[in-house]
Amino acid sequence: MSSQKIRIRLKAFDYNLIDRSAQEIVETAKRTGAVVKGPVPLPTKIERFNVLRSPHVNKTSRDQLEIRTHLRLMDIVDPTDKTVDALMKLDLPAGVDVEIKLQ
């Protein structure tokens, strides 16, 4: 599997969770002898919502809510078979979305 690259993109609402997951991936890849670039923090996506507080009147009274989506990007250069096996066995928390691409 030499001269390949694995690109891993992590997405989560909690930045502590995503940083711990990224650290686990980096440690696992380095332990198996691969070169890791990253994690690179990508811009945080912020979605804002305005919701009426009252079901009937008082249109001027509203709640403002937001959801922040944190992103991290990392590349694993020249992965070995051990690296791929270790990453497949890695157990990450449920709040982290992982996208893996082979390039």
Curated annotation (Swiss-Prot):
GO terms for biological process: translation. InterPro entries: Ribosomal_uS10 (IPR001848), Ribosomal_uS10_CS (IPR018268), Ribosomal_uS10_dom (IPR027486), Ribosomal_uS10_dom_sf (IPR036838). Keywords: Ribonucleoprotein, Ribosomal protein. HAMAP family: Ribosomal_uS10 (MF_00508). Involved in the binding of tRNA to the ribosomes. Belongs to the universal ribosomal protein uS10 family. This is Small ribosomal subunit protein uS10. The gene is rpsJ.
